[in-house]
Amino acid sequence: MPKTVLSDMKTHMEKTVAVLKAEFQKVRTGRASTAILDSVKMDYYGNPTPISQIATLAIPEPRMITITPWEAKQISVIEKAIFNANIGLTPSNDGKSIRLSLPPLTEERRREIVKDLKKMAEDNRVALRNIRRDAIDRLKKLEKDKSITEDELKKYEKEVQDNTKSFEIKIDEAMTNKEKEVMEV
């Protein structure tokens, strides 16, 4: 039973870190990344569809993304979806493809982005601590129900704490890497 508590906790913590890393990928840095468009959905025959599923996305230059739709008639719909997504980029349409030019980030904007990243990281650290608290509560309940001894409880609590620390380190590493990427000119 305690092993189930620990494996559930690990699974939740892994998901928390994975979600943070996915959120970090969406954050605009000085370089072009197709991840910026992951949240942009467009109406494709009545269904909200990610742009990546109906067009080829490419990065021909460090600060440019090109979108080439597989169906030419979808170009205006994609363009409208990008405008409506409010991602801070203005599409330019040449009839066959859409180009998104990423303006260089100012020092002030870079600092704002880093501040937002730190808030995201802290929110995820809080989520890890909540997962840790829930796991410890479940273990204490097992001890109260006499499923495990007090010594086993202490051992499992230490394991929970060690796992929490290792996942916090992963969050810190992801934060440091993303901060370097954002601050790089």
UniProtKB/Swiss-Prot annotation:
Domain of life from the UniProt record: Bacteria
Location relative to the cell: Cytoplasm
GO terms for MF: ribosomal large subunit binding
Keywords annotated in UniProt: Cytoplasm, Protein biosynthesis
PANTHER family: MITOCHONDRIAL RIBOSOME RECYCLING FACTOR PSEUDO 1, RIBOSOME RECYCLING FACTOR
Job description of the protein: Responsible for the release of ribosomes from messenger RNA at the termination of protein biosynthesis. May increase the efficiency of translation by recycling ribosomes from one round of translation to another.
NCBIfam families for the chain: frr
Name listed for the protein in its UniProt record: Ribosome-recycling factor
